Amino acid sequence: MLTIAMPKGRIFGEALELLRKAGYTLPPEFAESRKLMIEVPEENMRFILAKPMDVVTYVEHGVADLGIAGKDVMMEEERDVYELLDLKISKCHLAVAGLPGVRMNQIAPRVATKYPNIASSYFREQGEQVEIIRLNGSIELAPLIGLADRIVDIVSTGRTLKENGLVELEKIADVTSRLIVNPVSYRMKDEAVDELVHRLSEVIPQ
């Protein structure tokens, strides 16, 4: 049986649709279930529903054979997992944003983000020394209350930035969801994993 860690939320719905297109029979009530672990005996699969940031942890520690994780999570945390496939769902991008017309503080510039490693690496590559302030939510609030000069966050439609009076200043990287696998699981269950990869690759949107 393959155990697959899936992120809750919007990505979950898109991933389910992709699995169904690939020919996997999943019960209609699957998307509405409040269970955190669901077995589908007909497909010899078990699904674990988790927070997006936790999916990689489950796969790395082997409690899940595979997982679906955003490229942003993969970039932020170096983990002992293999990236098998770009599923090309949940498309968005990482960006630097701030208040329009407001320059960075030249003495002690601060950047708020839930991606401290990505932000540190990006500004270092730009030759800028900044203080990184880690936040777990409502990142857009930071420039409005003077906590930070800039933010680094995921941007999808840009609506949240606009509604909070912020503008995108620099694009860092495109982000999509990826299929990842535990290295040991890949060796032990290679046939099942390869079949999943093949079937998904046939229906991935271009």
UniProtKB/Swiss-Prot annotation:
UniProt cross-references to InterPro entries, sorted A to Z: ATP_PRibTrfase_cat, ATP_PRibTrfase_CS, ATP_PRibTrfase_HisG, ATP_PRibTrfase_HisG_short
- What does the record list as GO biological process? L-histidine biosynthetic process
Q: Which residues cross the membrane?
A: none
- Is Nucleotide-binding set as a keyword in this record? yes
Keyword Disulfide bond on this protein? no
Pathway assigned in UniProt? Amino-acid biosynthesis; L-histidine biosynthesis; L-histidine from 5-phospho-alpha-D-ribose 1-diphosphate: step 1/9
The subcellular localization recorded is: Cytoplasm
Write the Enzyme Commission number(s) for this entry.
Answer: 2.4.2.17
Q: Which UniProt keywords apply?
A: Amino-acid biosynthesis, ATP-binding, Cytoplasm, Glycosyltransferase, Histidine biosynthesis, Nucleotide-binding, Transferase
Q: What is one cellular component GO term in this UniProt entry?
A: cytoplasm
Reactions mediated catalytically: 1-(5-phospho-beta-D-ribosyl)-ATP + diphosphate = 5-phospho-alpha-D-ribose 1-diphosphate + ATP
Q: Which GO terms describe its molecular function?
A: ATP binding; ATP phosphoribosyltransferase activity
Quaternary structure (record) = Heteromultimer composed of HisG and HisZ subunits.
Concerning HAMAP family, the annotation shows: HisG_Short
Q: Which family does it belong to?
A: Belongs to the ATP phosphoribosyltransferase family. Short subfamily.
**Purpose:** Catalyzes the condensation of ATP and 5-phosphoribose 1-diphosphate to form N'-(5'-phosphoribosyl)-ATP (PR-ATP). Has a crucial role in the pathway because the rate of histidine biosynthesis seems to be controlled primarily by regulation of HisG enzymatic activity.
Description of its domains: Lacks the C-terminal regulatory region which is replaced by HisZ.
Name this polypeptide is given = ATP phosphoribosyltransferase
Q: What is the lineage of its organism?
A: Bacteria, Bacillati, Bacillota, Bacilli, Bacillales
| Gene designation per UniProt | hisG
